[in-house]
Amino acid sequence: MSSAHRQSPGEQDGSPTPPAYISLDRGDIPATFVPRGTADGRGDRSRSERTDSKRDQRVSNDADDADFFHHVPVMAAEIVSLFATVPSGYVLDATLGGGGHAELLLEAYPSLSILGIDRDASALEAASRRLGRFGNRFTAVHSRFDHLRTAMNTARISEISGALFDLGVSSPQLDRAERGFSYRNDAPLDMRMDVSQPWSGADVVNGYTEDQLIRVLFENGDERFAPRIARAIIANRPIESTTELAGIIVAAIPAAVRRTGGHPAKRSFQAIRIEVNRELEILPDALDEAISATVIGGRVAVLSYHSGEDRIVKERFRSAETGDCVCPPNLPCVCGALRTVRLVRRIAKTPTTDEIAGNRRAASARLRVVEKIEQDVIGNLDETTEPR
């Protein structure tokens, strides 16, 4: 069976080795976001630069509270089960967070190790403390997931037995008021997953044109009142805080609509957060890289919580499954396309009603999984390995 395991110092001399935590401070990984100029639709960033030091000071205490990042992993049983058949070696947790899924996998499968990456340094610190008991079976690298190959090189790992992406913002990030992700708490308009990046929610809200704001709200939040909200934001700038922004959004939405469908600012906050962190922009390359790095028999699993995320996951998995075949769907492939994965499930799996009752943030979760296979021409393999 193929192995994706690297030899650690502890394996060489028999002594226990603490978990490795590789920080961006070493300059190993170019994961800091550099915003584009106004010609690319991202507005002026000087406002963010003036307030970075204050925001960073508020967030710097996050790593002191490792317990804060403990949360209930979504679809935990399903995640553990789907990695039961992968070869021994390293599984990449591309969105490590507090390490909940990683901990379950390490406990369930002694043959697996975890390479955890996350752009949130506070989460990495917390996960490193939580998973320290696993010694050299756990390594953490501060990185965005579209830099996963660089992270693997830094950790001296050439291939992986699988990968897990748990997309979106985590519960601890939402609950930490000063991070600025939530419309329920008063805080600066931050919304950065990596607080070292200069680009923040304030830059989007106060720097984008009306057309740019409409695009963000439509594309990232499916917000049907995007034009009204964008005009209200422009009229009330500068906007300093999350509660100020939430109030402006609520006032811009018709009263009859505000009474149903959850908090009126939810979609807009989600849309701005996605824009700040380039979440949809960097996802396709990350998925392609994860599939490429995975050994035969390994699996790539993605938990998404937003229709835009799920569309991208479905499209990239479909592309790998079909080899980007251009032949008519009802005719044999003659273009020479080679498939590299098979879908473990053709339809996304969703949480059980019991799980949703116990963890409301799991309600929108969608799980999609592919398994790496030997390259083969289209039509030579079964389409799925599990029932629909």
Q: Which sequence ranges carry the predicted segments?
A:
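S-adenosyl-L-methionine-dependent methyltransferase catalytic core, i.e., the SAM/SAH-binding region
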Residues: S2-R388
